């Protein structure tokens, strides 16, 4: 089972479905996804995985932003998460970097969402692999993930 099939299965368990688009050219980076979709990179909801003291921390942020983990994320969470290595990302989420979706992870994760995403009617997130994306409203994304919303950008 590939990452996209795994994500579809987990969506089903959550009682939700999202049509996904597949691009053979890849959507591994926010820039790649925006190019394939023909949208601004800010409309990409990238999922960045960090190591927390007890569980992974996933920050869903605008593709145009970088996460300020040393100051803003630390203020929101009460600790500064560490950068995660690819092996950790795969083991904790069930997905490879570049395809980590904002929900449907293997293990429970602490979720944080960039407040900047709420300025858009819809955003695009990875759908389990580096070739698939799906569209969702920011409010629906926050509802599904239960993410803490805040200012996380540098």
Enumerate the language-model features and the residues they cover.
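Extended, low-hydrophobicity, polar/charged segments
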Residues: 1-154
């Amino acid at each position: 089972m590939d990452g996209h099939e795994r994500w579809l299965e987990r969506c089903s368990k959550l009682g939700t479905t999202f049509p996904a688009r597949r691009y053979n050219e890849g959507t591994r980076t926010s820039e790649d996804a925006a190019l394939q979709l023909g949208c601004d990179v800010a409309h990409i909801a990238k999922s960045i995985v960090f190591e927390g003291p007890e569980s992974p921390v996933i920050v869903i942020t605008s593709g145009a932003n970088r996460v300020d983990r040393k100051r803003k994320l630390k203020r929101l969470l009460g600790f500064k998460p560490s950068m995660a290595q690819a092996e950790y990302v795969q083991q904790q989420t069930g997905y490879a970097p570049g395809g980590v979706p904002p929900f449907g992870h293997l293990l429970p994760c602490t979720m944080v969402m960039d407040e900047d995403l709420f300025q858009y009617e819809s955003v695009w997130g990875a759908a389990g692999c580096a070739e698939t994306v799906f569209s969702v409203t920011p409010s629906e994304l926050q509802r599904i993930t239960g993410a803490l919303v805040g200012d996380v950008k540098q």
